[in-house]
A protein has these predicted regions:
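Bacterial N-terminal signal peptides
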Residues: 8-19
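Soluble periplasmic/extracytoplasmic beta-strand elements of cell-envelope proteins
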Residues: 75-79, 175-179, 192-194, 352-357, ...
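Catalytic Zn2+-binding segment of zinc metalloproteases
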Residues: 377, 385-386, 394-411, 449
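C-terminal capping/extension segments of zinc metalloprotease domains
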Residues: 270-335, 342-363, 378-380, 384, ...
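Beta-strand-dense domains in secreted/periplasmic systems and polymorphic toxin scaffolds
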Residues: 205, 236-238
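Positively charged n-region of N-terminal signal peptides that target proteins for export
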Residues: 1-5
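Structured extracytoplasmic
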Residues: 23-190, 198-201, 211-219, 227-232, ...
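Substrate-binding clefts and substrate-entry loops adjacent to catalytic sites
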Residues: 374, 401, 405-432
Length: 565
């Protein structure tokens, strides 16, 4: 089955043809009017060394067909976050509303998805009318389809122009412009692709699809692949943006979107390897005569039962691909938690853990004695004091004795489809529990090493409170309690001690953009702190609190992965 590229349509749509009420820019460029070949004509092209372009394209197309065959057997998680944009009176662009999707990609019979988030019926998705304002309604599958340059990639459909060699990170690439022939079937890719020069895999492609049907519109996108297996480059990031595309109603489509894919090796994240390990016990270790060999006391048994429920939930979230395996980021979070505990002379036992939820919405919660913080929240926190504020609130829950629902200790409670995870796993607390955790968290912070640095935490809360009405999906939790709502924020007492928000100052960073702090390995689901470059901001436009930015990953090959012939 052909995987049709992403587009806007009244029958098979990516975006419903309804524009929200903000005025369109004074001038508009027809989508797809700037062809890739036109850009190439303004550049000095280089001669393609050694191989002819025809030979190279034969190999590229062969590798792309192999890529499609591989993707039919993979079911990665796919997350799309979209921010509709508007221009204020000062001429600055900022989010007006947002949309979010999380699911699992299935290309075994064309591009399909298994949604983790309940979607309204097809009719509702097509036309959404909100308080008299027309809104853009995105269907997420189209963004996931941008992992494929062309599901029927053939030389007969395209004209190829070699441009130059170029490094993307550590990987030397051939840069090739791609333009569909006049007699090619509709919906063909038009733009530029980067091909690594060892095995001739496509590692990046940037452009749109062409020609544009009368009742639909193709979006522009920039799709990146990473070397996740020997000889295999798999989709990891897709960035899409439109600033002046005209819809059928004459409004301008203005948005930015990020799509991330991960969870390519979920089977490897399980414990199947332990089953095949040969373990030999020494005779001395077979029988334990120590006190530890005694039956658990009632109190210890209750703790062990709660721990079993906690472990079951964490293992299930990790197996699904929603939680990262234990790693170095957990150690950073634990260090912050330990700093707070030590200065408060608070002993929560040796079983305190910290883990990272792999999704973008801003949320944190506890599963028993495990503190869970989302990747998106870690991304936007500006400093360690702000992180301490988040951790202190969750420590408040643990110190007050808020436990996990022990029904999860029964293993059959973990038998449910992955897409039902948000309905079957619920770690929300009551409003009274949240208020008590706020109070306890503030008490812990006042006796912590962060007590004199909480102004930045309060400033973060002010920025979040200001942005919350436009970003309801970014602040909407899926497993725990919300960090903020359109009216309230967590730990709101800190607002009083925070300085005023000054958007005109480049040295005041109340919150960071999404994606700048945490790096996710799409193959192993491991997370690490990104090695961010220190860059001085040249304008307030570059502050981008809670906003989306393009992807530019540093590409590299797997160690010791030779050329696959």
């Amino acid at each position: 089955m052909r995987v049709w590229p992403a587009f806007l349509s009244l029958s098979c749509v990516l975006v419903s043809l309804f524009a929200f009420s903000q005025g369109s820019p004074s001038s508009a460029v027809a989508p797809g009017s700037a062809s890739a070949s036109g850009e190439a004509a303004t550049q000095k092209t280089e001669a393609l060394p050694s191989r002819s372009l025809a030979d190279v394209m034969d190999r590229v197309i062969e590798r792309e067909h192999l890529f499609l065959a591989q993707m039919r057997h993979m079911h990665p998680m796919v997350e799309t976050y979209i921010q509709d944009l508007k221009t204020d009176r000062a001429g600055d662009t900022r989010p007006a509303k947002d949309q979010y999707f999380l699911g699992r990609l299935d290309m075994s019979d064309g591009a399909e998805d298994q949604s983790f988030i309940g979607e309204p019926g097809f009719g509702q998705r097509m036309v959404t009318h909100l308080t008299g304002v027309f809104s853009m309604r995105f269907l997420p599958l189209g963004f996931a389809q941008m992992v494929v340059l062309d599901s029927d990639f053939q030389k007969q459909y395209y004209n190829f122009t070699y441009v130059r060699r170029e490094f993307l990170g550590d990987v030397r690439c051939l840069v090739i412009d791609v333009q569909p022939k006049e007699d090619a079937p509709p919906g063909r890719f038009m733009g530029r692709m980067w091909v690594e020069d060892q095995d001739y895999n496509i590692v990046r492609f940037n452009g749109t699809y062409y020609p544009h049907p009368k009742t639909s519109y193709y979006l522009h996108f920039d799709s990146w692949r990473l070397n996740l297996r020997s000889g295999a480059w798999l989709p990891a990031y897709i960035y899409s943006e439109e600033s002046d595309m005209k819809t059928a109603l004459g409004k301008a489509l203005h948005f930015r979107a990020q799509t991330r894919l991960w969870g390519y090796d979920l089977k490897g994240l399980g414990k199947n390897t332990e089953f095949t390990q040969i373990l030999v016990d020494s005779p001395q270790s077979v029988k334990d005569q120590s006190d530890a060999a005694a039956d658990a006391s009632p109190v210890l048994a209750q703790r062990m039962w709660e721990r079993q429920a906690e472990d079951n939930a964490i293992d299930r979230l990790q197996k699904i691909g929603l939680m990262a395996p234990p790693g170095d980021v957990d150690k950073v979070l634990f260090t912050v938690a330990n700093n707070i505990l030590l200065t408060n002379n608070l002993d929560l036992g040796s079983d305190l853990r910290c883990r990272v939820l792999l999704t973008s919405p801003l949320e944190s919660f506890t599963i028993g004695h495990t503190i869970v913080i989302s990747r998106g929240l870690l991304d936007v926190l500006p400093d360690e004091a702000s992180l301490a504020m988040v951790v202190a609130h969750e420590l408040g829950h643990i110190a007050l004795g808020d436990t996990v629902d022990t029904k999860l200790a029964f293993s059959d409670c973990m038998f449910f489809p992955d897409q039902d995870s948000f309905q079957r796993l619920d770690f929300k607390r009551s409003p009274s529990n949240e208020e008590a955790a706020d109070a306890k968290g503030l008490e812990l912070l006042k006796n912590s090493p962060y007590k004199d640095k909480l102004a930045s935490a309060g400033l973060f809360l002010k920025a979040l409170q200001q942005s919350a009405p436009e970003l309801p999906n970014l602040i909407r939790p899926h497993l725990g309690n919300g960090f903020a709502s359109s009216k309230n924020v967590r730990m709101s007492t800190l607002l009083a001690s925070a300085p005023q928000l000054e958007p005109g100052r480049t040295d005041q960073l109340a919150a960071l953009p999404l994606g700048g702090r945490i790096k996710l390995d799409p193959s192993t689901d491991q997370v690490e702190l990104a090695k961010a470059q220190t860059i001085a901001l040249t304008s307030t436009r570059e502050k981008m609190p809670f906003e989306i930015a393009p992807f530019f990953p540093h590409l590299s090959r797997l160690p010791n992965s030779g050329s696959e012939k």
